[in-house]
């Protein structure tokens, strides 16, 4: 999808990775034209990502990773399932807003589910825990935080067992 998330991801990839080849499938014709004019190295296809002809036009066998980023969870899940059906061994990622859909991930053979709420929480945690925090994640619907941090020599946990490090 060529919504805000898809557009910004494509723009970011264009700006950070040399020779990246990106294709966006966007249903809305006006939006497809708008983002096609804004992106330099991205092919924008106007159509429905659930349409087999559109997937053929996107040349799915040559694609390495498919990221479904529409505003519709069901479309994102179905797109990922169709990609697996037509072009096995591709990495699939789907944006979901309904946490219960994460239960379908393995049965639908989707590699990664993107939950914007959890990603937002992780981003906020990184800023709250400034300094040596490398990554921060929430798990089990936000019940726990997993934080990867660099420990400096003056830190309290140095040379202590993890269970005694507070």
Question: Each predicted region: which residue ranges?
Answer:
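Cytosolic regulatory regions of ion transport systems
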Residues: 1-166
